[in-house]
Regions:
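Catalytic nucleophile loop
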Residues: 2-4
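Alpha/beta-hydrolase-fold enzymes
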Residues: 6-124
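Short, conserved loop/helix-junction motifs that constitute active-site signature segments
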Residues: 15-16, 153-158, 184-189
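Active-site nucleophile elbow and catalytic-triad environment of alpha/beta-hydrolase enzymes
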Residues: 134-153
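Short beta-strand/loop motif that positions the catalytic acidic residue
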Residues: 156-157, 162-165, 169
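Histidine-bearing beta->alpha loop at or near hydrolase active sites
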Residues: 168, 192-201
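Conserved alpha/beta-hydrolase "acid-adjacent" motif
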Residues: 170-179
């Protein structure tokens, strides 16, 4: 979304166009090195996602009646991709606690505090993302529109762009984020940078 917003602002010559943009592990072009997540998105029609993954928030919760992709379902999907890794991490946590290795235990606890911090996604946002990003690849194919106008990333000429990817990322694989550099065709080389972090997933 930040890439699209920057492109729209650049096309409008908006005075608040950002000076820099950092893209971290966000899918710009899902055709590159498709992952299990990409395969799931392309193997099912959008109606499947609406039927199987969207729920209504129950009463008396504050957002009751709202249709969402629940955080607990997102988390279950993430964990199910690498169950052995998560099981091993919790075994290590237990071992560190038993052996009094508090610093090591705290690292694992801190990671999972962040990992488990997921929010419900609204139905509209989630289904649009699946359709437009993962199924139709609208941005890299030049088909994404904002208020009826095609989004043209070549309009980005003043915003420096840094892309960051993890070598072992199995959700947004190597190349899917750095594909942004292929879209900003008029951005000068000194305003582009890419970082691939080895061993990170």
């Amino acid at each position: 979304q930040s890439t699209v917003a920057t492109a729209v602002m650049a096309a409008q010559k908006h005075p608040c166009e950002p000076r820099s943009l950092t893209l971290m592990a966000g899918p710009i072009d899902c055709r590159i090195n498709p992952t299990t997540v990409n395969k799931l998105a392309t193997d099912h029609p959008i109606e499947w996602f609406q039927t199987n993954l969207i729920s209504t928030v129950p009463f008396p919760l504050p957002a009751w009646g709202r249709r969402v992709y629940p955080g607990f379902m997102q988390l279950a999907a993430f964990v199910s991709m690498n169950p052995e890794r998560h099981l091993d991490a919790h075994k290590s946590l237990f071992r560190h606690l038993v052996e009094g290795e508090d610093d090591e235990a705290e690292k694992i606890k801190t990671f999972y505090d962040e990992y488990f911090a997921v929010l419900d996604l609204t139905e509209e946002f989630y289904l649009e993302t699946v359709a437009w990003v993962f199924q139709e690849m609208r941005l890299p194919l030049g088909r994404l529109k904002h208020r009826g106008e095609l989004v043209d990333c070549s309009k980005i000429t003043r915003t420096a762009i840094l892309t960051v990817e993890g070598e072992r990322d199995d959700i947004c694989s190597v190349g899917q984020t750095s594909a942004a550099h292929e879209l900003v065709t008029k951005l000068r080389p000194h305003l582009r940078s890419h970082h691939l972090q080895p061993g990170v997933g």
